[in-house]
Amino acid sequence: MSLEVSNINGGNGTQLSHDKRELLCLLKLIKKYQLKSTEELLCQEANVSSVELSEISESDVQQVLGAVLGAGDANRERKHVQSPAQGHKQSAVTEANAAEELAKFIDDDSFDAQHYEQAYKELRTFVEDSLDIYKHELSMVLYPILVQIYFKILASGLREKAKEFIEKYKCDLDGYYIEGLFNLLLLSKPEELLENDLVVAMEQDKFVIRMSRDSHSLFKRHIQDRRQEVVADIVSKYLHFDTYEGMARNKLQCVATAGSHLGEAKRQDNKMRVYYGLLKEVDFQTLTTPAPAPEEEDDDPDAPDRPKKKKPKKDPLLSKKSKSDPNAPSIDRIPLPELKDSDKLLKLKALREASKRLALSKDQLPSAVFYTVLNSHQGVTCAEISDDSTMLACGFGDSSVRIWSLTPAKLRTLKDADSLRELDKESADINVRMLDDRSGEVTRSLMGHTGPVYRCAFAPEMNLLLSCSEDSTIRLWSLLTWSCVVTYRGHVYPVWDVRFAPHGYYFVSCSYDKTARLWATDSNQALRVFVGHLSDVDCVQFHPNSNYVATGSSDRTVRLWDNMTGQSVRLMTGHKGSVSSLAFSACGRYLASGSVDHNIIIWDLSNGSLVTTLLRHTSTVTTITFSRDGTVLAAAGLDNNLTLWDFHKVTEDYISNHITVSHHQDENDEDVYLMRTFPSKNSPFVSLHFTRRNLLMCVGLFKS
Amino acid sequence: MSGKPSKPSSPSSSMLYGSSISAESMKVIAESIGVGSLSDDAAKELAEDVSIKLKRIVQDAAKFMNHAKRQKLSVRDIDMSLKVRNVEPQYGFVAKDFIPFRFASGGGRELHFTEDKEIDLGEITSTNSVKIPLDLTLRSHWFVVEGVQPTVPENPPPLSKDSQLLDSVNPVIKMDQGLNKDAAGKPTTGKIHKLKNVETIHVKQLATHELSVEQQLYYKEITEACVGSDEPRRGEALQSLGSDPGLHEMLPRMCTFIAEGVKVNVVQNNLALLIYLMRMVRALLDNPSLFLEKYLHELIPSVMTCIVSKQLCMRPELDNHWALRDFASRLMAQICKNFNTLTNNLQTRVTRIFSKALQNDKTHLSSLYGSIAGLSELGGEVIKVFIIPRLKFISERIEPHLLGTSISNTDKTAAGHIRAMLQKCCPPILRQMRSAPDTAEDYKNDFGFLGPSLCQAVVKVRNAPASSIVTLSSNTINTAPITSAAQTATTIGRVSMPTTQRQGSPGVSSLPQIRAIQANQPAQKFVIVTQNSPQQGQAKVVRRGSSPHSVVLSAASNAASASNSNSSSSGSLLAAAQRSSDNVCVIAGSEAPAVDGITVQSFRAS
């Protein structure tokens, strides 16, 4: 701390002379690199004579370069000086930029790879000799330092030494780091360091390591006592230590949250308030509004029966109205459209079905029906069942979307314009009359995409369908005319996932271009672009209150975004592979994520902590879903297995152990929460869906 | 800085770096596109650059594979990975087996090339039988019903074949499985669930075998349909036996039903029921989810009895019991193929039983036919070792019957069938054993009476093209002859419906027979009583044959108590051998004491 204070004071005191001295050193550096035209232009701009230039010695250049690499404020001043030069000569500026970029990795001309290797070896010895309670946390430091030393050796052109260095010390790392290391080892030339996204990310954003205060003080003492200038330099530039009070973590707790490309999540990343409660006021408005209207309009003999039916419904709902959830966002936090009368009737129908729901528990397991898609020549890439469980939409590798009716009701088309004009628009059954009964079919095909369809999503109103594809477009299909009504073009790369908001009107998509986008159905432009992931955003999911969006990425992180502000409000690390599926719990507080590493992790969105890890699957977990009452978590994957987990027990154990936040579960006993495992014969699972009465529907592809 | 030449690097063989294209490969590729000579340094630079680009393309292709819910990387994934990089994808590399290349080595180099077959346009235009690919179909079935997986064909069997094998080898594992959650989701008996609450688990309790009410009803329906008179219903029952999962708990009772049925009906000379029971055995063999190794000690004696028994039907000269022997021989061959191991030596023991009957000069002609049929189904080597050396002796046995010197018409028919069987199975083997000039004199000297006919058959086989050689071991068991034989036997045989009523018998000698039958199998469901003919001659036949029936019953009781399949088979065979001597008592000094008991009883009866 005292060193930092002295540096700041020294910098402020010599601001003017320091600035000019830096300029002279820059000119000296340009002259050294034989960039004569740039040198002459810069001399004219700055009114610097050759006499002043000769006063600067070689050692002064080295000192200024060291100061530039160390201090961040000097970068802005240097860029300001560069801007006149950029306008004059492009190629010279490009070479100058390349030279300066590479200079970041080179401290001096006499680069010594052996010196770095010796420093790393001493650090490794220190970690191995430390006490057992601190060893696992200190070992988290090895990977980022190893990678940065590799970058430095590679930037100086010593590629063979860099490879030997990695070969010698890679056995220290855990298995999930080897895969990330493999990507970095694709680099073989110094110029490629400037283009690789991971290298740029590790340079801009520091690698985050959570460490207890005692471990951190041990580490600092090691760096200072043994005069490890090399390691101290790397630590100050590229590492960020998020210290916490309490005991150090053991091996399991360290591994639980490690594995991401940018280390672990900072405490600051999960500080913001998240309103994870549900929007309950919307339902009451829908119920109170239609209550007086039918009574006034009805003059039939059935009028006395209707008030009797309405009264028992009002009482339990009115009692709920008095309760206010402190964790729920306000109803106008994001603008939601007004519900139409037909949508209100649909919601009433859904509420009535929910009252007949089967209560699932360990003693009452759900029943499941399996839909198998046969004769699919290029494979089923996605499957989706509508919320009312009447339709099944499948996307295929041959760019087509097919919809099946799962009930005896057929899929009917809207009547033509002349017939529609003759209809009575004020009649009660207008929604039934406008459909053509003669056009009923069991299945319909939707053609339009030019690449595999990776996701279909039904609108909550059951009249629209979204699909996204490898051809970088998102299409909105009408389920009344069975045609494509809108094509959204915003992503330039394949779109991996698309989801409708639970309240309709909004949908979100994620893509190969590392972004997720929030759209509205009546606009061609994206309303929000969620930027922050370092790799593909593989899956996306709306929160039940439509205010937040969760994304899973190939950089092995799960993020929660606020739709109102577009910011990342939660960052959760712990997966060892790409995140392949996401699901919110019924209460909105917990998030389950499945991954290519065969694991399922439960997160608490109130503080972003890891609740538990479920280990049972032996292949990619392709689909996760919660039961409607939130007591059972169903997961399935490409290993032809359906697993049912006791989520009620998970939350009970988590809340009772909620005292110590920084420590996670000590033991990952596999069978504590597992209720049942059901294998299918020859069908990997594509989708799972709980109906409103808690019947589980599975969709699989028969693998011949 | 950018113009600085990089140092030459040696090819890396590290696992972490993965494979990389060698400079030699780059030179070969350069030659293929017309570049005459490529220097070593340029080849190395190109190899490294191409290797890095290929690895990036493959990594992106893995992303497309994951999002398509697949675990195999296909050519289409590579195409989409190239498309993302704004590179034109390769065309013409669509392959179903994921490997579009063929491997060839010549001139000291290893090459992979794209197979490009030449297609005859005439064939394409002439044949219009191109099939339209099947349309998409959506099938639904119950996967789980309240936490239990129903045993429908779309669901996996509750206990796989490997689990059944593990149960038979190590029964102690069952105690652990009772407490395992994985087995709890499958339909099992209630005993395992009850064991969870009992602190002290006794091994003896696990030996109990409970069937649910549905399973008992299923067992009753299946067994009645398989041996009933309704042929379409029998077909459905056999189809269900051959394909349904979840039958492993009823398997012990099924095998016992077949074994007891064969014992009773072979005494009653009921050919139709024997045929039905053999078809049940075949259905159980065809079921892929059943593990039959634990029940071979009941199935193999039953099948062996149907092959080598002396008399299988009431009227040997009219009924086609030869078809049953052929069918059972094919069943035995399939059993040996499926279950023969180095520890049980199943095929060796079966072959020994057949060859022992062949070595005996006093074997009945029907049993001789069965032995030859059984050996011929076991393969060419068995025919070469066991049948060919005995051809001369078989000729001496059947020559008197075929030349008309025998009075019995049954023996004449049997001799004809034996000759037909030998002419069918021996010529392909003889063609390989003997040299080209086939003369009738040589064959007559070597094989006796059958020599000239065998010579003609061998000559015919030599002149036929190689593609038309009959395959001896056919995997498919033909059921058409056996079905027609069953219908014939049912029509001709005067068999009453299954009933437990005992009808009056005119002869005094029949009463001990009926009493003996009921005493030995009191709980048997099917007891068939033959009506006696009013003719005096027929009564004499019945009276004279009562002694062999008693002997057979004793042998059957003895065989039932034996747990070793070899001993059981020997018992059945010895019982058949004893019946070959009508009223003559033969005492073999070196036989087992049990066989001595049979001989003593036979001596006393006569």
Swiss-Prot record, chain A:
Nucleus is among the record's keywords: yes
GO-annotated cellular components: nucleus; transcription factor TFIID complex
Disordered: annotated span: 287-336
A Pfam family that the UniProt record links to this protein: WD40
Family statement drawn from the similarity comment of this UniProt entry: Belongs to the WD repeat TAF5 family.
Main location: nucleus
Function of the protein: TFIID is a multimeric protein complex that plays a central role in mediating promoter responses to various activators and repressors. May play a role in helping to anchor Taf4 within the TFIID complex. May be involved in transducing signals from various transcriptional regulators to the RNA polymerase II transcription machinery.
Statement: the UniProt record of this protein carries the keyword Transcription regulation: yes
Segments passing through the bilayer: none
Subcellular location: Nucleus
Compositional bias of kind Basic and acidic residues: 314-324
Name of the protein this chain belongs to: Transcription initiation factor TFIID subunit 5
Keywords noted in UniProt: Nucleus, Repeat, Transcription, Transcription regulation, WD repeat
Lineage: superkingdom: Eukaryota
Lineage: Eukaryota, Metazoa, Ecdysozoa, Arthropoda, Hexapoda
WD repeats: 376-405, 448-478, 490-520, 532-562, 574-604, 616-646
Subunit structure: Belongs to the TFIID complex which is composed of TATA binding protein (Tbp) and a number of TBP-associated factors (Tafs). Interacts with Tbp and Taf4.
GO biological process: transcription initiation at RNA polymerase II promoter
Coiled-coil region list: none
UniProtKB/Swiss-Prot annotation, chain B:
Keywords, in A-Z order: Nucleus, Phosphoprotein, Transcription, Transcription regulation
Oligomeric form and interacting partners: Belongs to the TFIID complex which is composed of TATA binding protein (Tbp) and a number of TBP-associated factors (TAFs). Taf9 and Taf6 exist as a heterotetramer. Interacts with Taf1.
Cited function: TFIID is a multimeric protein complex that plays a central role in mediating promoter responses to various activators and repressors.
Any single GO BP term: RNA polymerase II preinitiation complex assembly
Classification via Gene3D superfamilies: Histone, subunit A (1.10.20.10), TAF6, C-terminal HEAT repeat domain (1.25.40.770)
Keyword Transcription: yes
Protein name according to UniProt: Transcription initiation factor TFIID subunit 6
Signal peptide positions (record): none
Gene Ontology cellular-component terms listed: nucleus; SAGA complex; SLIK (SAGA-like) complex; transcription factor TFIID complex
